Amino acid sequence: MRESLKKLLHIEDTPERTALAFSIGIFLGFSPFLGLHTLAGLAVAFLFKLNRVAILLGVWSNTPWWLVPFYTFATWLGMWVIRFRIDWATLERMFQLGKEKGFLTSEFWMQIASQWGLLASFLTGSLILALLLSLIAYPLSLN
């Protein structure tokens, strides 16, 4: 049983492969694809036969405490990169709609979707920061 578990989890990988799995997990955990991080991590781990524990530790390093500050900064970075501007009145209107109608309503998300630049900024900034964090994580986890 113990040997089967080791094979399933790929615990006995080389340090380089374990560090790679962790850094891929970091990338996926901080990617903009909210709600799919764990599934994506497991899919990548099984597809490339990587250390499942290391990849999940990387994915789960983006805790709820980090979500708002990270994605706020990522969106700001994306806005700077793609040169997108949005006025505060529009942001306030969207936030007010979310508070009144609910952040999970189709009306709120239709308003968000109408601001394509905001979504593009979110995606761009999140991918840049996720890549940067994963590149930092590899050498740190290797040592």
Predicted features, each with a name:
Residues 3-11, 63-82:
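Hydrophobic alpha-helical transmembrane segments
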Residues 4-28:
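Small-residue-enriched transmembrane helix starts and helix-helix packing motifs
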Residues 14-18, 22, 34, 38, ...:
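Hydrophobic alpha-helical transmembrane segments of integral membrane proteins
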Residues 23-24, 57-61, 124, 128:
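Hydrophobic residues within alpha-helical transmembrane segments
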Residues 31-44, 48-74:
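Transmembrane helix boundary and interhelical junction motifs in multipass membrane proteins
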Residues 75-105:
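Juxtamembrane non-transmembrane "cap" segments at the membrane-aqueous interface
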Residues 101-121:
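Membrane-interfacial helix-loop-helix junctions in multi-pass membrane proteins
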Residues 120-143:
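Transmembrane alpha-helical segments in integral membrane proteins
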